[in-house]
Amino acid sequence: MSHVELQPGFDFQQAGKEVLAIERECLAELDQYINQNFTLACEKMFWCKGKVVVMGMGKSGHIGRKMAATFASTGTPSFFVHPGEAAHGDLGMVTPQDVVIAISNSGESSEITALIPVLKRLHVPLICITGCPESSMARAADVHLCVKVAKEACPLGLAPTSSTTATLVMGDALAVALLKARGFTAEDFALSHPGGALGRKLLLRVNDIMHTGDEIPHVKKTASLRDALLEVTRKNLGMTVICDDNMMIEGIFTDGDLRRVFDMGVDVRRLSIADVMTPGGIRVRPGILAVEALNLMQSRHITSVMVADGDHLLGVLHMHDLLRAGVV
């Protein structure tokens, strides 16, 4: 395209709003296609013992990739196969236990129609999403989902706009309907998103990130305050636990306790840790969610907490551990 000058006073906002108005109207019309065929499609996907395989060419392929990703992350195992690659070997990934969703606005994608006889021989259930109920794909489908739109938002009527939006929304409708039917929970969602913020909050537990073994700062009750301070410094967690030979907790000493000792004006060289420790101390169980430990630490205004099974010391958790894990 040759260089053109911007028309004086061209209103980008108005052009954008016109697109939204057209696509909003098309989506409102889509409601009529959430019908018995939609139920049949959902049932085939719900009872599928394999995976939902999504296919599409061009812009429909881009929508198909997103659709497969949404299915997979909401409890319906799914993947995308490019129809061109399917015709050259990738169709081997499809089994009779799968369900295929084929997308084409015209319903006449030659790359997809060429695959239909093979899918039929494999007895793979076929759901076609098209904008043309009389198309080849619609007639060949076990279930046809219509996404016909009155017009594209593109003023030339050429660039897929309203039609791709309608297809995307139909995919979301399938995914969410199945999600609800399966009783899919936030915890289930987190399992497929372990790297996301929600996944970390719903999956990461204290025992995944706590300090254990030699990393635990601890001294005996008979230790001097000086020895306890050396342990605090060596382990760099701002505290030390006071425990016996069996790692049974007797108390805790933190950098906050040290400041209070200095405020008392006593000779710290003559003190034992038993003189200044806090008996007992706050502790959490190793199996609780890291975010629960975070909430406790924030409510108690502490930066570290003991991890224990009853009085038996198992580890120590510091606020920095939660920061590194992305929980905060």
UniProtKB/Swiss-Prot annotation:
Binding, Zn(2+): H82
Summary of subunit composition and partner proteins: Homotetramer.
Domain CBS: 210-268, 277-328
The name this protein goes by in its record: Arabinose 5-phosphate isomerase KdsD
Keyword set, alphabetical order: Carbohydrate metabolism, CBS domain, Isomerase, Lipopolysaccharide biosynthesis, Metal-binding, Repeat, Zinc
Organism per entry: Escherichia coli O6:H1 (strain CFT073 / ATCC 700928 / UPEC)
Residues that bind substrate: 75-76, 82, 88, 114-123, 148-150, 222, 275
Molecular-function GO terms, alphabetical: arabinose-5-phosphate isomerase activity; carbohydrate derivative binding; metal ion binding
Catalytic reaction equation(s): D-arabinose 5-phosphate = D-ribulose 5-phosphate
Site (Catalytically relevant): K59, E111, E152, H193
Matches recorded under InterPro entries: CBS_dom, CBS_dom_sf, GutQ/KpsF_isomerases, KdsD/KpsF-type, SIS_dom, SIS_dom_sf, SIS_Kpsf
Protein function: Involved in the biosynthesis of 3-deoxy-D-manno-octulosonate (KDO), a unique 8-carbon sugar component of lipopolysaccharides (LPSs). Catalyzes the reversible aldol-ketol isomerization between D-ribulose 5-phosphate (Ru5P) and D-arabinose 5-phosphate (A5P).
Domain named SIS: residues: 42-184
Superkingdom of the organism of origin: Bacteria
Gene name of the record: kdsD
Gene3D superfamilies: CBS-domain, Glucose-6-phosphate isomerase like protein, domain 1
Family affiliation: Belongs to the SIS family. GutQ/KpsF subfamily.
Entry's EC annotation: 5.3.1.13
